[in-house]
Amino acid sequence: MDKLVIEGGQKLAGEIVVSGAKNAALPILCAGLLSAEPVHLDNVPDLQDVRTTLKLLGQMGVRTESADGKVSLDASKVDNLVAPYELVKTMRASILVLGPLVARFGEAKVSLPGGCAIGARPVDQHIKGLQAMGAEINIEHGFIEARAKRLKGARIITDMITVTGTENLLMAAVLADGETIIENAAREPEVGDLASLLVSMGAKIEGIGTDRLVIQGVDKLHGAKHTVVPDRIEAGTFLCAVAAAGGDVTLRHVRPQILEAVTDKLRDAGVTIEEGDDWMRVRMNQRPKAVSFRTSEYPAFPTDMQAQFMALNTLAEGTSQVVETIFENRFMHVQELNRLGANITIDGKTALVNGVEKLSGAKVMATDLRASASLVIAGLCADGETLIDRIYHLDRGYDRMESKLTAVGAKVRRIKGNQA
């Protein structure tokens, strides 16, 4: 397994170009299944999860081409409606083929998902919604099997806000017979980006960006061209890295307006942030102030930024409380941060972070995608050398992170698994 070695103590300066959003790219790739005509995408990040999704689509008979952030999909000859365990186990977002397959082909067989080890993320909301639209669903031998002659429009009220659930039901509804209303829908920008692609393919969707989506089903969708929204979590991660390590960095290809929950807290910590339409400049030359926060659904503070901001808080002046309301078991980075000298205690859904004056490099292990990013941030600040093991987690969600950090002055290098 590859490892990262970080020599801490370097200030960061320069420019970073932010990649397309992982959490938009994955559902958008799956949406290619909804049309027999080609879909052309731009600003697709080069990530392990994207490669896994393309492999999955390829096994179903979708012709895929990808190079330099551009991906073309041709689903005119889909001949396999099964998403196998071997691929789905590595990436939970594979469940997103379920809605498109049932909507366009009338059946699907999708393995129950895997992905990040951060607690139970049940697919029952996906299943209930599809059943409300007339799908017959059985779960046996580790697979979800769904059938429907044609899905029927329905009013769906999800029991909880679910991003992938909203996306799956939205993709199913665009080809259903009649009107579908999704209440308590996720409002994340990545859901809105998927909806924008679907509209450009001929779907009829109202309420994009709100918690109530109204979809008028159409008989078929056509091809389209679409540019994936910038990754707000990647941008937020780099903002926290500069805030923790110190320096002066400009981020390009960002949407500041979808990052406000994070930038508000960074300003509270003493960070200077300037913004334009598609850029942000972050400057920090002092010890951060401790900032408490609570994760919640968009537009509140994102759970996917909790670990990175906690890494910043480890070095802050004062004590902060971090409350995680979305996922249980999402404090696995705490014991690794403590190995670097942090002072964090956990009580249920709350972490109490007592800021320390310095961290010291050590060997640590990444446990999930965002936890690995928090260890990178801590390593940038720690005295001496930090070695992060199991960084395949990082590769699932960050496009060339170490080369982007190196370009702004960090001392980061990758040790290949066969050299470690």
Curated annotation (Swiss-Prot):
It comes from the Bacteria. The keyword DNA repair does not apply. One of its GO terms (cellular component) is cytoplasm. The modification 2-(S-cysteinyl)pyruvic acid O-phosphothioketal is found at C116. GO terms for molecular function: UDP-N-acetylglucosamine 1-carboxyvinyltransferase activity. It is found in: Cytoplasm. Its main location: cytoplasm. Pathway: Cell wall biogenesis; peptidoglycan biosynthesis. GO terms for biological process: cell division; cell wall organization; peptidoglycan biosynthetic process; regulation of cell shape; UDP-N-acetylgalactosamine biosynthetic process. The active site is at C116. Its EC number is 2.5.1.7. It holds the Pfam family EPSP_synthase. It catalyses: phosphoenolpyruvate + UDP-N-acetyl-alpha-D-glucosamine = UDP-N-acetyl-3-O-(1-carboxyvinyl)-alpha-D-glucosamine + phosphate. CDD domains: UdpNAET (cd01555). Phosphoenolpyruvate binds at K22, N23. UDP-N-acetyl-alpha-D-glucosamine binds at R92, R121, P122, V123, D124, Q125, D304, I326. Keywords: Cell cycle, Cell division, Cell shape, Cell wall biogenesis/degradation, Cytoplasm, Peptidoglycan synthesis, Pyruvate, Transferase. Belongs to the EPSP synthase family. MurA subfamily. Cell wall formation. Adds enolpyruvyl to UDP-N-acetylglucosamine. This is UDP-N-acetylglucosamine 1-carboxyvinyltransferase. It comes from Paraburkholderia phymatum (strain DSM 17167 / CIP 108236 / LMG 21445 / STM815) (Burkholderia phymatum). The gene is murA.
